[in-house]
Amino acid sequence: MEIWDAYYLDGTLAGSILVRGKPIPEGLYHLVSEILVRHTDGEYLLMQRDPRKPNYGGYFEATAGGSALKGEDAYCCAKRELREETGINAGTLTNIGRFLSHDTIYETFLCVTDCDKNSVTLQEGETVSYKWISEAEFIDFVNSDAMIDVQFQRYLPHLKQMGYIK
């Protein structure tokens, strides 16, 4: 059973818990961290979702991420999820945005890493492949139908700031 802290809309702790799979009460939210990974050489990491996943199975996504566990803030969640889903140990993460959707608060981060590109690991049931793509290929990716739309919306402020939107 996965236990989460409940949050108010403004991101403050509500003092109650939520359980994955159970309805989230009106006025409460759960916290999700997402991480965009860029190598110091300018390439971006894309992870291919397991085809068995119910949502967007088989799609490549420009993220690692997931729900914050009870007692975990967005930053700690991002570091844990990145390590679990890619094997990358982030030094510093930069918060690049906040997005609200239904009963979820998304905190998005950028990880700039100099990791060995061949050391990326896959998480059973989550991902089946990965690839590093150039900045030009990443710009094409975010401006195409290949990028998961809800993920695009969450990264949009950062993508605009970087001049990546055509």
Regions found by a protein language model. Give the residues of each.
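Acidic, metal-coordinating catalytic segment for phosphate/diphosphate chemistry
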Residues: 1-34, 40
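Short loop segments at secondary-structure junctions
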Residues: 10, 39-42, 50, 112-117, ...
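Nudix hydrolase/Nudix homology domain
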Residues: 21, 58, 101-117, 121-166
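Conserved Nudix-box catalytic region and its N-terminal flanking loop in Nudix hydrolases
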Residues: 22-33, 39-80
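Short alpha-helical functional segments enriched in proximate histidine and acidic residues
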Residues: 85
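A short coil-to-beta-strand element that immediately follows conserved catalytic motifs
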Residues: 89-97
